[in-house]
């Protein structure tokens, strides 16, 4: 036979009796099983999962006798996947019953010994006899306890109303749980943690599954809710403990096998593969045992990729001619790291579409030759995504195509060529077994004797048949083996496999929780740094996002007609060292409208910490409509991680169908918890931490309850929340909390720019909107609102707290003022609701939908380190402490809200000022010290205040001729009024330092004297015949050239005549033939004279002249005391009189011009 005549040796298809692909039938219940299970009743279902149906599941007894520990591990994982969650209809599948049959089969095969023996071989470490004996003995006890419990559970299921059956199953549950928990120490004995690891993982699984049952049946067995809650808390704790133990000792065993040579890598990879199957796959399913998080039937998928041995491993020694590839001599073998780098790193999940195989040829002497598989080009595709090629090996020679398409390769049989003599090496032929019951064989000519072995992939990853298998081929890589002289001896392929539970599509079920691992997304884009990392806790890779940029992850999913009309909650399992928010959006090809929801997530770990079980948490949306319409059943989901520096790990996305009745029950439970959380245990008082906003939110929850399903519960909850509202209002020391009247007699005082809002989407009660500060000319006038808590309402040495809620704000200052000011500044984003606000059918506020968004975002906020003291938190509360109470002083506490900037604003409501409690300990001592310091300071303030007050009062008293302040004393001049005014203005502490709009301690005294001074000014203006003679109204009433102006010097208005050609005049009316006194206070600066001339209609004239000689020093002075007052008598003959003022050179400053009628 010629080696070049290969036409007759093309790929041979071995067709099955039927070539129809049935992708819905897979390894036991590791897929959707749509066709198989759709019409199955629960009895058939239980029979199938308990292995009575040979078509769908193996018989545990026959399996154990034929296969090894890996096969048992595969069957156990598949059995668990089949029974996750709680079906909507029918009984809960007893995973426990099936596992008992697998772990303690009827043929008495000791599976636990097989587990231990296998790990001994993998890591070359024997388990001490005493350690093994203790473990086996405790396993026997565990078996008895679990079987007895399972028997009682089945009896109770048949007689659910029997108190005897309930009592028995309750007793046996407690016994089984205790024994399983106690025995776990036997499977983690010191120095044998890794050899016992599969035993530990299986025992842990049994314990957690037993604990799961009390969450499902506990109430029916008679457990009080407190006990059920305690069991749940313990289950969560043990799940974390068991998971961390498994990962820790898996890593320890793997690292122990790390080496440098090719054979060491084979051992390393074999341990990794088999421990994934026996341990880590199980750990990945532990979270699904949580019946509270997974209360529905659940579809789980494992997307990790494992690799079988390089073809031709572990064959040396079976015959004198057969040799493993790594024992070839002389050969330049690949290193440990070279082989490790051949494997595909964690990445997006792909499906194998096609294999193009290339053939190499080797001649050995003149007679022997053979063709062998030299390399391959794989065509891979993402889920609903694009295809791409991967190459490996020698890409030369004849090309053969193995189409895969929508089928799976579940089994491969290789013929390995590994002859010691002449170091012959290769693979030929190879048979691929497909899930449509066909086989395709690659076979090429060869002619030589000896050194051949047939290797079946089923020896490493077991299968039942084309309908029932655990893994599919996902990847192939290969490497050359050369002699030390460089001659190619052959090529060795390595096969990658994924679990068959990972479906070819991302299907969302209408009645099951659908888990879609994150690496089944199709692409990602954005500014964050991202990569996939091995997820030892997760059954597949996790996506790590880091850096400050945002990132969009695109996921295409599919559903059926029933699923298209279903609403879902979307839940993301993640870990993060910083809180943040996901935005979920969906759209289908036939419905371009985008449906979106926000999901807040909290930080679950410290910065750059390693992943553990407990670092993973769930972030969940409210019910949303995915917007699926038309005939299309595929649509796109986008998950956007907001910008912000963080290390975020995403495990999977879950779609939880919303069942109307279930959702109503859940809503009732949430409302009950919210209302109960408002009260103390006695239900007669509020929790001190409860806020008015929380009471309103609880009312919203009650409002959304179904009237048809829960009329009585809703009525009772309404009564409770109304009582809570009454108690909130009773403890609130603020007046007018409904903002009925701003600037009324009692309550709030405010500036312009305050709007009272009713029906705001965030506030059930009335709320306030504060606009930005106003800017007029160069002055900025803040928007403010304040209220004083009267001293009589306060208690000594007590802490009071201000609480409230902010919809959004910018530069909002909130102050509490007593002896000192406490202040916070709030810059709160408007981020609680989506851009399109929820409305009801009438176009009004949809409180039910609004609640979901608000709760999700507040959950994120409440996880912050600073709580509601953070500047961007929506809720706020901060305190102030009192010292001694002084009713005479009536300092009280001032509550202030202020917008000081022109771009500031705020919306706020639910304001409360409440007593928190008396001070004690160090806080009390500190307050007493502060009080003493304050009293000392007040004594000094009072002394200074009294001195300035009495000086000002005496100055004002001297202005008046009577006690009724109706007449000025004769001879009172403007300078007297200005002097008195200066004294009044010198009174300190008139306004509050923190907010000038708030009266200070001397405000009343200051106001009294200011009013009297104003009366003096009014009387003075009446006696001065010249209007605006003091220029307090600028140039009003005066005629002046454009260069003349009035300047404000201290509290005095001064007319400034700057030039010799400047002119100021006024015409006014007097009583003719009466004697007046013209009095002018002025000052001349520089050379020249200043003139004030008065004349009447008869040309009668008097002149007052000012120059620098009027000052005794003769030196130019800017001091106000240098102003000179001059007078002259004037008796006008006419009613009309004129005043003219000018100067010859320099500057002429005039403070006042008076024409006063002399008394007789």
UniProtKB/Swiss-Prot annotation:
<dbReference type="InterPro" id="IPR005638">
    <property type="entry name" value="Pest_crys_dom-III"/>
</dbReference>
<dbReference type="Pfam" id="PF00555">
    <property type="entry name" value="Endotoxin_M"/>
</dbReference>
<dbReference type="InterPro" id="IPR041587">
    <property type="entry name" value="Cry_V"/>
</dbReference>
<dbReference type="InterPro" id="IPR036716">
    <property type="entry name" value="Pest_crys_N_sf"/>
</dbReference>
<keyword id="KW-0843">Virulence</keyword>
<dbReference type="GO" id="GO:0090729">
    <property type="term" value="F:toxin activity"/>
</dbReference>
<dbReference type="Pfam" id="PF03944">
    <property type="entry name" value="Endotoxin_C"/>
</dbReference>
<dbReference type="InterPro" id="IPR005639">
    <property type="entry name" value="Pest_crys_dom_I"/>
</dbReference>
<dbReference type="InterPro" id="IPR036399">
    <property type="entry name" value="Pest_cryst_cen_dom_sf"/>
</dbReference>
<dbReference type="InterPro" id="IPR038979">
    <property type="entry name" value="Pest_crys"/>
</dbReference>
<dbReference type="Pfam" id="PF17997">
    <property type="entry name" value="Cry1Ac_D5"/>
</dbReference>
<dbReference type="InterPro" id="IPR008979">
    <property type="entry name" value="Galactose-bd-like_sf"/>
</dbReference>
<dbReference type="GO" id="GO:0005102">
    <property type="term" value="F:signaling receptor binding"/>
</dbReference>
<dbReference type="Pfam" id="PF21463">
    <property type="entry name" value="Cry1Ac_dom-VII"/>
</dbReference>
<comment type="function">
    <text>Promotes colloidosmotic lysis by binding to the midgut epithelial cells of insects. Active on various scarabaeid beetles such as Anomala cuprea, A.rufocuprea and Popillia japonica.</text>
</comment>
<keyword id="KW-0800">Toxin</keyword>
<dbReference type="InterPro" id="IPR048645">
    <property type="entry name" value="Cry1Ac-like_dom-VII"/>
</dbReference>
<dbReference type="Pfam" id="PF03945">
    <property type="entry name" value="Endotoxin_N"/>
</dbReference>
<keyword id="KW-0749">Sporulation</keyword>
<dbReference type="InterPro" id="IPR001178">
    <property type="entry name" value="Pest_cryst_dom_II"/>
</dbReference>
<protein>
    <recommendedName>
        <fullName>Pesticidal crystal protein Cry8Ca</fullName>
    </recommendedName>
</protein>
<comment type="similarity">
    <text>Belongs to the delta endotoxin family.</text>
</comment>
<dbReference type="GO" id="GO:0030435">
    <property type="term" value="P:sporulation resulting in formation of a cellular spore"/>
</dbReference>
<dbReference type="GO" id="GO:0001907">
    <property type="term" value="P:symbiont-mediated killing of host cell"/>
</dbReference>
């Amino acid at each position: 036979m010629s080696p070049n005549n290969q036409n007759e040796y093309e790929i041979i298809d071995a067709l099955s009796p039927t070539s129809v692909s049935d992708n819905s039938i897979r390894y036991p219940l590791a897929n959707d099983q749509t066709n198989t299970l759709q019409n199955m009743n629960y009895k058939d279902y239980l029979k199938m999962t308990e292995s009575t149906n040979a078509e769908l599941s193996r018989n545990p007894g026959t399996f154990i006798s034929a296969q090894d520990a890996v096969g048992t591990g595969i069957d156990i994982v598949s059995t668990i996947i089949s029974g996750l969650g709680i079906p909507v209809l029918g009984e809960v599948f007893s995973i426990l019953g099936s596992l008992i049959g697998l772990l303690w089969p009827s043929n008495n095969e000791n599976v636990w010994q097989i587990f231990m023996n296998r790990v001994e071989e993998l890591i070359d470490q024997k388990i001490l006899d005493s350690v093994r004996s203790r473990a086996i003995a405790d396993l026997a006890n565990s078996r008895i306890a679990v079987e007895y419990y399972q028997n009682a559970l089945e009896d109770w299921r048949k007689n659910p109303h029997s108190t005897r059956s309930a009592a028995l199953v309750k007793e046996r549950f407690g016994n089984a749980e205790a024994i399983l928990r106690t025995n776990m120490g036997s499977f983690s004995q010191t120095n044998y943690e890794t050899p016992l690891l599969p035993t530990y993982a299986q025992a842990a699984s049994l314990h957690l599954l037993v604990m799961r049952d009390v969450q499902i049946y506990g109430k029916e067995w008679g457990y009080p809710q407190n006990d059920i809650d305690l069991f749940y808390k313990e289950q969560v704790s043990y799940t974390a403990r068991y998971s961390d133990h498994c990962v820790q000792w898996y890593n320890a065993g793997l690292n122990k096998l790390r080496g440098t040579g090719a054979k060491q890598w084979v051992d390393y990879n074999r341990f990794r593969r088999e421990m994934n199957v026996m341990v880590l796959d199980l750990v990945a399913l532990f979270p699904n045992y949580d019946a509270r998080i997974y209360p529905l039937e659940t579809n789980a998928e494992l997307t990790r990729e494992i690799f079988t041995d390089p073809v031709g491993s572990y064959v040396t020694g079976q015959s004198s001619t057969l040799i493993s590839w790594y024992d070839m001599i002389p050969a330049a073998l690949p290193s440990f790291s070279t082989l490790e780098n051949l494997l595909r790193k964690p990445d997006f999940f792909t499906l194998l579409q096609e294999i193009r195989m290339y053939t190499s040829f080797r001649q050995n002497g003149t007679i022997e030759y053979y063709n062998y598989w030299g390399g391959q080009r794989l065509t891979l595709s993402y889920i609903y995504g694009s295809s791409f090629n991967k190459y490996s090996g020698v890409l030369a020679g004849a090309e053969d195509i193995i189409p895969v398409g929508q089928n799976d390769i579940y089994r491969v049989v290789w013929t390995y060529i590994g002859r010691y003599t002449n170091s012959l090496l290769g693979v030929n032929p190879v048979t691929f077994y497909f899930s449509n019951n066909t086989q395709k064989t690659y076979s090429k000519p060869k002619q030589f004797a000896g050194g051949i072995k047939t290797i079946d992939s089923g020896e490493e990853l077991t299968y039942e048949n084309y309908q029932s298998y655990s893994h599919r081929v996902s990847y192939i890589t290969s490497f050359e083996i050369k002699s030390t002289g460089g001659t190619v001896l052959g090529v060795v392929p390595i096969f990658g496999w994924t679990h068959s539970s990972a479906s070819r599509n991302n299907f969302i079920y209408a009645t099951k929780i659908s888990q879609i691992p994150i690496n089944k997304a199709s692409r990602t884009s954005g500014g964050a740094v991202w990569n996939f990392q091995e997820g030892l806790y997760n059954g597949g890779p996790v996506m790590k996002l880091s850096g400050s940029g945002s990132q969009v992850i695109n996921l295409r999913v599919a559903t059926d007609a029933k699923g298209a009309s279903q609403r879902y909650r979307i839940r993301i399992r993640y870990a993060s060292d910083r809180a943040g928010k996901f935005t979920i959006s969906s759209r289908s090809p036939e419905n371009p409208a985008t449906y979106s929801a926000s999901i807040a997530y909290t930080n679950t770990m410290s910065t750059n910490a390693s992943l553990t079980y407990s670092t993973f948490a769930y972030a969940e949306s409210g019910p949303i409509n995915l917007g699926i319409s038309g005939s299309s059943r595929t649509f796109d989901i986008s998950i956007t991680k907001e910008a912000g520096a963080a290390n975020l790990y995403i495990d999977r996305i879950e779609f939880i169908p919303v069942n109307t009745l279930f959702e109503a029950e859940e809503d009732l439970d949430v409302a009950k918890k919210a209302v109960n959380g408002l009260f103390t245990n006695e239900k007669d008082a509020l929790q001190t931490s409860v806020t008015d906003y929380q009471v309103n939110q609880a009312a919203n929850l009650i409002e959304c309850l179904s009237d048809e399903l829960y009329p009585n519960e809703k009525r009772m909850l309404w009564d409770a929340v109304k009582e809570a509202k009454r108690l909130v209002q009773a403890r609130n020391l603020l007046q007018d909390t409904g903002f009925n009247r701003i600037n009324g007699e009692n309550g709030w005082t405010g500036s312009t720019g305050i709007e009272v809002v009713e029906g705001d989407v965030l506030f059930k009660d009335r709320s306030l909107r504060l606009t930005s500060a106003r800017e007029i000319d160069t002055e900025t006038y803040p928007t403010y609102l304040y209220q004083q808590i009267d001293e009589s309402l306060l208690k000594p040495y007590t802490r009071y707290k201000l609480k409230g809620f902010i919809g959004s704000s910018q530069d909002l200052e909130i102050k509490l003022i007593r002896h000192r000011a406490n202040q916070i500044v709030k810059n709160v984003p408007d981020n609680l609701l989506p851009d399109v606000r929820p409305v009801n059918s009438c176009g009004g506020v949809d409180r039910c939908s609004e609640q979901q968004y608000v709760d999700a975002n507040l959950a994120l906020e409440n996880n912050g380190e600073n709580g509601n003291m953070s500047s961007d938190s929506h809720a706020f509360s901060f305190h102030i402490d009192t010292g001694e109470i002084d009713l005479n002083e009536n300092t009280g506490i001032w509550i202030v809200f202020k917008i000081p900037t022109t771009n500031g604003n705020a919306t706020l409501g639910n304001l409360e000022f409440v007593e928190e409690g008396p001070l004690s300990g160090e806080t009390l001592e500190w307050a007493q010290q502060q009080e003493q310091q304050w009293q000392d300071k007040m004594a000094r303030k009072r002394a200074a205040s009294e001195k300035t007050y009495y000086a000002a009062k005496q100055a004002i008293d001297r202005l008046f001729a009577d006690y009724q302040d109706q007449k000025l004393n004769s001879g009172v001049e403007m300078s007297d009024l200005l002097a008195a005014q200066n004294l009044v203005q010198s009174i300190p502490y008139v306004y509050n330092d923190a907010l000038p709009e708030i009266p200070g301690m001397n405000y009343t005294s200051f106001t009294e004297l200011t009013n009297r001074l104003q009366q003096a000014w009014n009387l003075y203006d009446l006696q001065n015949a010249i209007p605006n003679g003091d220029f307090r109204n600028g140039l009003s009433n005066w005629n002046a050239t454009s260069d003349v102006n009035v300047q404000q010097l201290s509290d005095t208005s001064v007319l400034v005549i700057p030039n010799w050609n400047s002119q100021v005049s006024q015409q006014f009316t007097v009583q003719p033939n009466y004697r007046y006194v013209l009095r002018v206070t002025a000052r001349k600066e520089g050379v020249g004279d200043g003139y004030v001339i008065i004349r009447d209609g008869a040309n009668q004239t008097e002149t007052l002249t000012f120059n620098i000689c009027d000052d005794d020093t003769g030196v130019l002075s800017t001091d106000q005391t240098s102003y000179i007052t001059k007078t002259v008598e004037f008796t006008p003959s006419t009613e009309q009189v004129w005043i003219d003022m000018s100067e010859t050179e320099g500057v002429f400053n005039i403070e006042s011009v008076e024409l006063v009628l002399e008394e007789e």
